[in-house]
């Protein structure tokens, strides 16, 4: 009895047992979901029954399979087909244009600045029609231009008003100067007349004194 009682596993507390059962349930549920996802992925990736696979175009097929082109065909067969994804969702293609010498597009692509094929007006209309920000940018530029014109007009009006004020003030100063000059001249004349009268009076007195003697 003692050996049988000693070999028994001690009972776990009810809380630990509940936690263990929940963990087992969660693992079973995760395993079932994983199996379902694998099934869906394999089902949708497999071609339908009776599907005849056509010949796929391979990247190395653009180079003729002739002696001497083995290295180039091998390079194209294992070349990366996806671009390098940069931050903000911008894709950089590993290719160079021989016209503009920029990376990211090939010769003849519409992204090239030297692309001049087709009608330029139609291309501009296409860009304006496809780009949702084109109208907003154009309106912003027009608004900035109008604001700039208004600012320049205001500056011009302020400068003309300042010129008018300065001209009026300068004309007023000139008139004041003229009046001062006239007053000064008048005072000088009066002083000169007084001096002349005094001289005449002195001369007459001196003549009278000489006559009396």
Swiss-Prot record:
Enumerate the GO terms in the molecular function aspect.
Answer: zinc ion binding
Basic residues: bias regions: 176-204
Report residue spans for region: Disordered: 1-61, 154-213
What residue intervals correspond to the zinc fingers (CCHC-type)? 96-114
Region (PIM1-binding) residue spans: 1-147
Q: Where is the composition biased (Basic and acidic residues)?
A: 9-21, 52-61
Spell out the subcellular localization from the entry. Answer: Nucleus
Cross-link Glycyl lysine isopeptide (Lys-Gly) (interchain with G-Cter in SUMO2) mapped to chain: 121
Predominant localisation class:
nucleus
The protein's name: Retinitis pigmentosa 9 protein homolog
Gene (UniProt): rp9
